[in-house]
Amino acid sequence: MAITKSKQQKTRKKVKRVVSDGIVHIHASFNNTIVTFTDRQGNALCWATSGGSGFRGSRKSTPYAAQVATERAAAVAKEYGMKSVAVFVHGPGPGRESTIRELITQDFKIVEITDVTGIPHNGCKPPKKRRV
């Protein structure tokens, strides 16, 4: 006779790290804005995008959509206990300034703001001019 043991699932409660200071990476392209909160080592804690916040098409590339995405990511970052951030802005998109403004509104202490947009040393040919 086989004796059946009742297997009990051992579930451990996930311990959330406390990260008091971190980095905010803002990738602002012409079509979308991606906001990522990381710790000092660069490990991603949370992120949000304009498209993931419910905006589609041309509304996705507006400063308001970037503001809403920042609001969503900041709410999760506050659960980690984040208070002060360094901001790295990448790209020429319309969500650059509104994202930083929203971080100030969310009561984050901004330690530094750095623009890390890549500058081509005569790299790729730019797209042709629009004829409207």
Curated annotation (Swiss-Prot):
Residue ranges annotated as coiled coil are none
Q: Which Pfam families match?
A: Ribosomal_S11
Whether Disulfide bond counts among this entry's keywords is: no
GO MF annotations in UniProt: rRNA binding; structural constituent of ribosome
The protein's UniProt keywords, in alphabetical order, are: Ribonucleoprotein, Ribosomal protein, RNA-binding, rRNA-binding
| A Gene Ontology biological process term | translation
Domain of life where this protein originates: Bacteria
Q: Does the keyword rRNA-binding apply?
A: yes
Q: Which GO terms describe its cellular component?
A: ribonucleoprotein complex; ribosome
Query: How would you summarize the oligomeric state and partners of this protein?
Result: Part of the 30S ribosomal subunit. Interacts with proteins S7 and S18. Binds to IF-3.
Q: Which function does this protein serve?
A: Located on the platform of the 30S subunit, it bridges several disparate RNA helices of the 16S rRNA. Forms part of the Shine-Dalgarno cleft in the 70S ribosome.
Q: Which family does it belong to?
A: Belongs to the universal ribosomal protein uS11 family.
NCBIfam families, alphabetized: PRK05309.1, uS11_bact
What's the name of the protein? Small ribosomal subunit protein uS11
Please give the organism.
Legionella pneumophila subsp. pneumophila (strain Philadelphia 1 / ATCC 33152 / DSM 7513)
Q: Which taxonomic lineage is given here?
A: Bacteria, Pseudomonadati, Pseudomonadota, Gammaproteobacteria, Legionellales
